[in-house]
């Protein structure tokens, strides 16, 4: 069992049964519990609360404020990069994954190798 609060089902069931039945809790021997619940008279020392006049209502706001919040300054909106964020000096991630940029007009989209960029041997060389 996981460490933590342990309780007894017997204690919980006894507490539920005594609460439902409305019985008195077990009295220690030698003590007397012969008080009738209707013996005492409840006397309130505070006066009853005053009732409000029916004409007293919430007053409507007649003047509307011109603006609620101050105007926003031109802010700095950082873009989320499409690479994962790795904190510096992190030993778990030695190799950083490479994510090529997305888009149509990237320089190496159609020229992927060096062989395509070099001139062919059939061309005449300028001397």
UniProtKB/Swiss-Prot annotation:
Q: Which UniProt keywords apply?
A: Secreted, Signal
- Example of a GO biological process term: positive regulation of biomineral tissue development
Which segments of the protein form a coiled coil according to its record?
none
Superkingdom of origin organism:
Eukaryota
Q: What Pfam family is a match for this entry? A: ODAPH
Signal peptide segment: 1-23
Tell me which tissues or organs this protein is expressed in: Expressed in enamel organs and not expressed in the heart, kidney, or spleen.
**GO cellular component: a single term:** extracellular region
Membrane-spanning segments: none
Instruction: Name the job this protein performs.
Output: May promote nucleation of hydroxyapatite.
Kindly give the PANTHER family that the UniProt entry links to this protein: ODONTOGENESIS ASSOCIATED PHOSPHOPROTEIN (PTHR40376:SF1)
- Could you tell me what this protein is called? Odontogenesis-associated phosphoprotein
Q: Which organism is it from?
A: Rattus norvegicus
Q: List the gene name.
A: Odaph
